[in-house]
């Protein structure tokens, strides 16, 4: 019985130290940066409530990643020599819609929460696969009667 209690105690202590390490691992480094395959964004938030802290951090990261996508898509859209002012405006609206739609598919790849002085601070990193975002943008453009005739897909893909 003594051995059983000792083993349970030892398992508890080792489990707690592993849990503490997992909770204090920073969400930094190249593994959490945007690369050729993924758009990634990080954010931090603080609140008196742990859930509110996480929600605020995810919302801030979502905003950051949608801004990245918009900037990349607008830069790639400059490759479209056939777009006039009306098409640019329509394209911008389409990008806005696609980024909102894709932001619903965010994946949290790192989350770190800690508490100090009665407040919770949460760091998160979210990601979206670039290939999926590009595919959604292209499919939306191809489904638009006005834009599909002017759209130069290969130039857009190369610039994206």
Which residues fall in each region the model found?
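Positively charged n-region of N-terminal signal peptides that target proteins for export
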Residues: 1-5
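Bacterial N-terminal signal peptides
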Residues: 7-17
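Domain-level marker for long, solvent-exposed, non-transmembrane regions
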Residues: 22-160
């Amino acid at each position: 019985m003594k051995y059983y209690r000792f083993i349970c105690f030892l398992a508890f202590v080792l489990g707690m130290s592993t849990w503490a390490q997992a909770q204090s691992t920073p969400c930094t480094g190249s593994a959490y940066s945007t690369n050729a395959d993924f758009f990634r964004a990080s954010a931090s938030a603080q609140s008196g409530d742990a859930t509110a802290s996480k929600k605020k951090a995810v919302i801030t990261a979502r905003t950051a990643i949608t801004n990245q996508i918009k900037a990349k898509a607008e830069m790639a859209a400059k490759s479209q020599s056939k777009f006039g002012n009306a098409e640019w405006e329509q394209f911008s609206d389409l990008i806005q819609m696609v980024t909102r739609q894709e932001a619903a598919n965010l994946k949290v790849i790192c989350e770190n929460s800690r508490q100090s002085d009665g407040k919770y601070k949460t760091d998160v990193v979210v990601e979206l696969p670039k290939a999926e975002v590009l595919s959604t943008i292209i499919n939306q453009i191809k489904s638009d009667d006005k834009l599909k005739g002017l759209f130069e897909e290969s130039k857009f893909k190369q610039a994206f």
